[in-house]
Amino acid sequence: MTLAQSNLLLLLTAAMWGSSFVLQKMAMDIMEPFIYNALRFTLAALCLMPIRYFRRGNIDVIKSTDKRHMLIGTISAGTLMFFAVAFQQIGIKETTVSNTGFITGLYIVFVPMIGVALGHKYNPKIWLAILIACSGLYLLSGMDGLYMKKGDLFILISAFFWGTHLIVIDMISHRHHPIAFAIRQFFVCGILSLFAALITGESLIVPSMEGWFYICISGVVAIALGYTFQIYGQKVTPPSQAALIFSTEAVFSAVAGIYFLGEVLGSKALIGCLLMLGGSLMAQFYPPLNHRMTEQKSLS
């Protein structure tokens, strides 16, 4: 695969992820968030299992110590993913697809904030990037003083968990095959979502074929296929380029929200989106100064 083909594959992935916010919002009109997450992440895990099976011959046998590491890692990552998608689905009911896409993109800004707490050192300019992104959030959300709309607040909490999830993935996934790791964390997320659905008394019955359509497209295309595209694309595209390409996810979400749902971005909100995107992109140029670089295990 050439670099141009790889970049195109990652751009397609960003488009799939950004556009899928429309389906996530429409799904909330006919079903509840926890059972929706339970079904789509379980379906995604099942879709990835054949890929893992046919590639198993190229992977070394996992040692017992790595099995324990895999278990702890996937439970941690899957739990963080559960909280991230739970807050995201609850929040998207109360806000627009455009806001969801751009606020979710702030996970890139949360990474250095969390990293500092873990002892990572950053270029001081990273705080300028964070300030720019936060200014954009203020404009996009139409905040009155320190008050933020409930839906946007839930999406912001979701972005925090996505940032934490990214740090955990960076710390542990380099020791394991990416598809195997993904399957396990998707199952953990799906199981926890099912428990949450039971505890909160959600209906476990999908009310219509329309609901199954949203589940299948999200589970098969956005999660399973999107993740696979990401893995193959990042085998060729450098991390810095990949991060820039993935930042377009927010743009695709805004375009999808405007085209499919008739959402409107006012001038203040549009400026906020640009500031958030700019702050997130700026944050990409200041990685931790004292953090090791890791590589994912190859699929081949």
Question: Which residues does each PLM region occupy?
Answer:
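Glycine-/small-residue-enriched transmembrane alpha-helix faces in small-molecule transporters
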Residues: 1-35, 87, 144-171, 295-300
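Helix-helix packing/entry segments at the starts of transmembrane helices
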Residues: 14, 37-39, 100-106, 169-190, ...
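Hydrophobic/small/kink-forming positions within alpha-helical transmembrane segments
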Residues: 18, 22, 78, 82, ...
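Hydrophobic transmembrane alpha-helices of multi-pass small-molecule transport proteins
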Residues: 48, 122-142, 162, 193, ...
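Juxtamembrane helix-loop-helix junctions in multi-pass membrane proteins
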Residues: 15-46, 62, 96-99, 164-188, ...
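C-terminal-most transmembrane helix of multi-pass membrane proteins
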Residues: 41, 49-57, 211-213, 247-300
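Loop-to-transmembrane-helix transition segments
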Residues: 5-15, 59-87, 150-158, 197, ...
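Specific transmembrane alpha-helical segments of multi-pass solute transporters/efflux pumps
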Residues: 20-21, 49-100, 104, 139, ...
